[in-house]
């Protein structure tokens, strides 16, 4: 470790101890050397004894800075790792930091645009940022080419070395977790950090976010439910993104939405429909749909439309994952726990040798109490959480795409019930899921698959004769090879039989000669000739094996 890393690690540990976070480690795991090390190098009393543990963890992460704040936000979605009182506190972490100098942002924009001054591309550039976060900040301007209002998102200068340094230390701490916590190995801390690293590094590349936004906008073009602002790719680079400026009501501002006459029931239901459309129709979903990234258009409040921003984190599911997920939901709400267990095994989410009966019993034990509530109050996100937590006891591997899905679903549910507390998520989602599953099977699905593949087969038609000829030639060559191998095996079998025959005769002659040499010395050279014949037979048998 470099001196800088040692200093930073020392500061991190002192911060954790000042908030009494050593309480997370069972006393039996704190050995005498560790205790001496703690009191000699890190004498730091808990200065926040009056606060609950979850709040202390949140405050410590806030003190450690942006990288740790975002790490805490990610951990808040992994409710399989923490009890609710800690996960709820981590969810309160706010990614708000002081803005960096607008002049620096202006310099970065000019560097990204080939060294030309900002005024060559933009009018009314606002040096004061509109918003600021740990990774980037946003400035407003107008495009010189068409006068449209835009926002310019710029990555913080020199943020990458800071992120890499702190990630290296987070990895070090993650490797200590299995040694300090009894359940540490099951939590797979290194995998959790690796997942966070990928998400964070992806957020540093604004070209990726631009592509995500363009894709989502295309998927919901002319949709009455969701609007994604236009991105101007000619102005985008890894460190800068330019997109249409939008005006909307923050989805968390319920009072303003009601004052504007918004149809709250329809708005809440559309949030659910948008989510399931992204997941099951498009296989591409916005995975950071917390209230800060969602607005509602001022226009047509009786027919409300969402506006989504900040598309840095997206998720996708393959066709099999979508089918298993939809069938899991329907089987769960039908209380068919056997089907749920079988789907987990069939999907490969749990090992194929899993005992289905035991797994079914475990799912029933955990999930049956959920139905004590009315269906309208059951949370899809918590259903998934309960299923995944149970499956992890049966060695379910961490599925990053499903973790993202569960996190997003919790956001969608939270927003929906904040807007309209009577929202019946199951009633809204069930027709969509049943319709989607119906579309995946039967004759319509077969016809659709044929239509999708038809251009491919039309393109390959001229190549078919050659492909058939090649297949026949390869088949003939394969048959010739198989016949050759069969003949060699038969020949080896015959040689081995002959070898065993000669070795048996040789052994008999040698033993007979030895016996006669000892018991019948009057027979003269006869025993010697028998032994010599036996050795010759042995030699012939040995040669047959080669």
Curated annotation (Swiss-Prot):
Chief location bin: membrane
Coiled-coil blocks: none
Pathway given in the UniProt record: Cofactor biosynthesis; ubiquinone biosynthesis [regulation]
Keyword Cell inner membrane applies: yes
Chain residues that bind ATP: 130-138, 153
GO cellular component terms, semicolon-separated: plasma membrane
Domain Protein kinase: from-to ranges: 124-502
Localization terms from the record: Cell inner membrane
Alphabetical list of InterPro entries matching this protein: ABC1_dom, Kinase-like_dom_sf, UbiB, UbiB_bact, UbiB_kinase
Any one Gene Ontology molecular-function term assigned to this protein's record: ATP binding
GO biological process: regulation of ubiquinone biosynthetic process; ubiquinone biosynthetic process
Topological category with respect to the lipid bilayer: Multi-pass membrane protein
Membrane-spanning intervals of the chain: 501-521, 522-542
EC class (word): transferase
Keywords of the record: ATP-binding, Cell inner membrane, Cell membrane, Kinase, Membrane, Nucleotide-binding, Transferase, Transmembrane, Transmembrane helix, Ubiquinone biosynthesis
Cystine bridges: none
EC id: 2.7.-.-
Active site feature: 288 (proton acceptor)
Similarity comment: Belongs to the ABC1 family. UbiB subfamily.
Functional note: Is probably a protein kinase regulator of UbiI activity which is involved in aerobic coenzyme Q (ubiquinone) biosynthesis.
Family annotation (PANTHER family): CHAPERONE-ACTIVITY OF BC1 COMPLEX CABC1 -RELATED (PTHR10566), PROTEIN ACTIVITY OF BC1 COMPLEX KINASE 7, CHLOROPLASTIC (PTHR10566:SF113)
The protein's name: Probable protein kinase UbiB
């Amino acid at each position: 470790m470099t001196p800088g890393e040692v200093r930073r690690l020392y500061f991190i540990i002192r911060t954790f101890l000042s908030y009494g976070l050593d309480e997370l480690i069972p006393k039996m795991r704190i050995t005498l050397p560790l205790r001496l090390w703690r009191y000699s190098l890190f004498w730091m009393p808990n200065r926040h004894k009056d606060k609950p543990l979850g709040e202390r963890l949140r405050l410590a992460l806030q003190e450690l800075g942006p990288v740790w704040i975002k790490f805490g936000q990610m951990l808040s979605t992994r409710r399989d790792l923490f009890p609710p009182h800690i996960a709820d506190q981590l969810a309160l972490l706010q990614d708000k930091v002081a803005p960096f100098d607008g002049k620096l942002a202006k310099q970065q924009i000019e560097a990204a645009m080939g060294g030309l001054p900002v005024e060559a591309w933009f009018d009314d550039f606002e040096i004061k940022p509109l918003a600021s976060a740990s990774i980037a900040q946003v400035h407003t301007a107008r495009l010189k080419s068409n006068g449209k209002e835009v926002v310019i998102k710029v990555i913080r200068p020199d943020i990458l070395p800071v992120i890499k340094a702190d990630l290296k230390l987070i990895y070090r701490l993650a490797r200590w977790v299995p040694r300090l916590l009894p359940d540490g190995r099951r939590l797979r801390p290194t995998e959790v950090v690796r997942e966070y690293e990928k998400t964070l590094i992806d957020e540093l590349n604004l070209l990726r976010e631009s592509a995500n936004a363009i894709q989502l906008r295309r998927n919901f073009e002319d949709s009455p439910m969701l609007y994604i602002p236009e991105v101007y790719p000619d102005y985008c680079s890894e460190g800068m993104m330019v997109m249409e400026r939008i005006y909307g009501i923050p989805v968390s501002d319920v009072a303003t939405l009601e004052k504007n006459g918004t149809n709250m029931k329809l708005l809440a239901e559309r949030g659910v429909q948008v989510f399931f459309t992204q997941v099951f129709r498009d296989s591409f979903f916005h995975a950071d749909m917390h209230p800060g990234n969602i607005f509602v258009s001022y226009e047509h409040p009786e027919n409300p439309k969402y506006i989504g921003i900040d598309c840095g984190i997206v998720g996708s599911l393959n066709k099999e994952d979508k089918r298993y997920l939809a069938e899991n939901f329907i089987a769960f709400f039908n209380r068919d726990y056997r089907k749920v267990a079988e789907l987990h095994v069939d999907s490969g989410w749990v090992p194929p040798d899993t005992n289905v009966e035991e797994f079914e019993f475990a799912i029933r034990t955990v999930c049956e109490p959920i139905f004590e509530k009315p269906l309208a109050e059951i949370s899809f996100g918590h259903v998934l959480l309960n299923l995944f937590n149970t499956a992890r006891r049966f060695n379910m591997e961490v599925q990053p795409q499903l973790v993202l899905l569960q996190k997003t679903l919790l956001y969608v549910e939270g927003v929906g019930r904040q807007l309209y507390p009577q929202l019946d998520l199951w009633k809204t989602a069930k027709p969509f899921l049943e319709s989607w599953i119906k579309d995946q099977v039967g004759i319509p699905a077969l016809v659709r698959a044929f239509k999708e593949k038809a251009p491919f087969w039309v393109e390959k038609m001229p190549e078919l004769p050659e492909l058939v000829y090649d297949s026949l030639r390869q088949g003939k060559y394969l048959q010739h090879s198989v016949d050759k191998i069969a003949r060699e095996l038969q020949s080896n079998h015959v040689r081995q039989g002959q070898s065993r025959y000669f070795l048996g005769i040789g052994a008999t002659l040698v033993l007979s000669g030895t016996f006669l040499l000892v018991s019948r010395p009057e027979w003269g050279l006869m025993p010697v000739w028998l032994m010599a014949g036996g050795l010759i037979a042995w030699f012939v048998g040995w040669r047959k094996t080669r």
